[in-house]
Amino acid sequence: MDDKYFREDQWSISPYNFEESVLKRLELPSNVKIHDATLRDGEQTPGVVFRKEDKVRIARLLDEVGVDRIEAGMPAVSGEDFQAMKEITASGLKAEIFSFARALTGDIDKAVECGCTGVVIEIPIGYPKLVHQFGWTWEDVLRKSVNCLKYARKK
């Protein structure tokens, strides 16, 4: 089934994007940067595992098509991810290379060691996970977040 909001096996878009109330508030910036997370988020698909060579090749292809930022992976996850990211950052791409990191200083250090331009930092905020798995309070989350962001900015 094809219509103006959906093309089978190709793409879909919410019709709500074209609602008058949405369009009235729409203020597009003059410059948009494309941040691609294929190399990290794509590996979270069941059955998908990129080898180092795959990651480097995909990063080069993303750069060729003009992607501004490539989220190349999470170097704290494995030695192979770390090596792939080092190779990607050293390969002279025009794109900025970002790392994904938990809100841990060690993860930030790995991103810096790889030569990344920037880092996407995550911290869990789901209540059951915070309370039951980590034993954290909301204040702990805020404190850890602020401390990690300050640390990353210094690096």
Model-found features: residue ranges?
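Non-membrane alpha-helical structural segments and their capping/turn regions in soluble enzymes
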Residues: 49-56, 82, 135-146
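Alpha-helix-loop-beta-strand connector modules within alpha/beta enzyme cores
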Residues: 18, 78-102, 140-155
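Hydrophobic, small-residue-rich alpha-helical packing segments that form membrane-like cores
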Residues: 105-155
